[in-house]
Regions:
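Conserved H-loop
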Residues: 60-66
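Helical segment within the ABC ATPase nucleotide-binding domain
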Residues: 45-59
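Conserved catalytic motifs of ABC-family nucleotide-binding domains
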Residues: 27
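Conserved beta-strand-loop-alpha-helix hinge in the C-terminal portion
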Residues: 86-113
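Conserved ABC nucleotide-binding domain
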Residues: 1-8
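ABC ATPase nucleotide-binding domain "signature motif"
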Residues: 11-17
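Catalytic Walker B motif of ABC-type/P-loop ATPase nucleotide-binding domains
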Residues: 31-34
Length: 123
């Protein structure tokens, strides 16, 4: 559908889908994703999170996902590194042993999200 389109003709969400797909298509051993969803609407964000999980499972690529969004981290990750404030150091390594797709309203998901939130409070 978008094969003949120029980047300027694509919506932000479509362009981001293409970028993520292209990154996985290169079959890298390691993929670094630094806040890839930016100001994307929540519906597209949920869709892309599930696509990243699907592609990660299909390819076996190690994905390092950088985010300030706690719910996103708990939804996507097998391991979360909780950092301290400046200067940033690893405060805790947390394993998340929940099956995908994760239920964001499930009690265990909420418990983990709350725990991570409590660990990063420095006020």
């Amino acid at each position: 559908k978008f094969a003949e389109s120029y980047p300027s003709q694509l919506s932000v969400s479509t362009e981001q889908r293409m970028v993520i797909g292209r990154a996985f298509a290169m079959n890298p051993d390691l993929l670094l994703m630094d806040e890839p969803y930016g100001q994307m609407d929540i519906k597209m964000r949920f869709y892309l999170e599930d696509e990243v999980i699907r592609l990660w499972k299909e390819t076996g690529t190690t994905v390092i996902f950088i985010t300030h969004n706690i719910e996103e981290a708990v939804y996507l990750a097998q391991k979360v590194l909780i950092l301290t404030n400046k200067p940033a150091k690893v405060k805790e390594r947390l394993s998340i042993d929940l099956p995908h797709p994760r239920n964001v309203s499930g009690s265990e998901f909420i418990r983990i999200r709350k725990y991570v939130t409590d660990q990063i409070k420095w006020w």
